[in-house]
């Protein structure tokens, strides 16, 4: 999924359906289930969009939970609560917006209406989310005041551990964790080259940057099936940092 504003491709799955699945996955994460394993059970056509929503919501989950506590001091049932927090995480995110706020609210309410397990909570979700849109700034100020989990979107014990272990860098470390991870590729140098891959990416409308060695970074993440040469084994997905690990270790031997 590559939304711009609230636009998407004509064949993209409806946002309300993606939100339903995202809420169920996030509910599973809260219950201790692996997100990676859960994503494998999502239909292939739905997976890229659902994964993007889940990753974005998780990056702002601490703030979303604090906002939900203000909007609904008594927690709703588990699944509607997950949908509400998912929507609040997406609405409060400082990432470039994927959808217009009113579109997101409308589709979150639609997601509740179309799910028998959440239908009775649709009006409640609508009221909470529309209140957030009306009172966004004061609600955010209150949520962030003195709440480490809301401010940094990590458990307080982890924030305190970083403060202790990295007294001059802890804030930068936590801030970097809020940034969407880049999508790095590794060229199979037995079958292609960095320059050849970048030319093919450019021809496919994908901007890229050559990193060190065989690494290429995409300007915007894309589904792997769209990447030229991926299916043929000419390129794989691996972070540029991980690609440096083996050479650095060998250099130290």
Feature-to-residue mapping (PLM):
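Class I Rossmann-like S-adenosyl-L-methionine
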Residues: 1-226
């Amino acid at each position: 999924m590559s939304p711009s504003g609230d636009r998407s491709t004509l064949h993209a799955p409806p946002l309300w359906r993606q939100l339903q699945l995202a809420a169920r996955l996030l509910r599973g994460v809260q219950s201790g289930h692996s997100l990676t394993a859960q994503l494998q059970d999502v239909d292939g056509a739905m997976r890229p969009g659902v994964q993007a929503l889940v990753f974005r919501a998780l990056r702002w989950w601490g703030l979303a939970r604090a906002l939900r506590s203000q909007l609904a001091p008594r927690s709703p049932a588990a699944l509607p609560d997950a949908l509400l927090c998912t929507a609040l995480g997406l609405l409060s995110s400082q990432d470039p917006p994927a959808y217009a706020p009113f579109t997101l609210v409308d589709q979150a309410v639609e997601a509740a209406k179309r799910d028998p397990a959440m239908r009775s909570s649709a009006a409640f979700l609508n009221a909470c989310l529309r209140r957030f849109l009306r009172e966004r700034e004061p609600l955010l100020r209150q949520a962030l005041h003195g709440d480490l989990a809301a401010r940094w979107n990590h458990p307080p014990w982890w924030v305190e551990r970083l403060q202790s272990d990295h007294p001059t860098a802890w804030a930068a470390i936590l801030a970097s964790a809020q940034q969407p991870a880049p999508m790095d590729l590794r060229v199979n140098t037995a079958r292609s080259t960095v320059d050849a891959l970048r030319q093919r990416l450019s021809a496919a409308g994908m901007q890229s940057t050559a990193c060190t060695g065989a690494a290429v970074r995409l300007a915007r993440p894309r589904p792997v099936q769209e990447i030229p040469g991926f299916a043929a084994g000419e390129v794989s997905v691996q972070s540029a940092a991980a690609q440096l690990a083996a050479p650095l270790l060998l250099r130290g031997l």
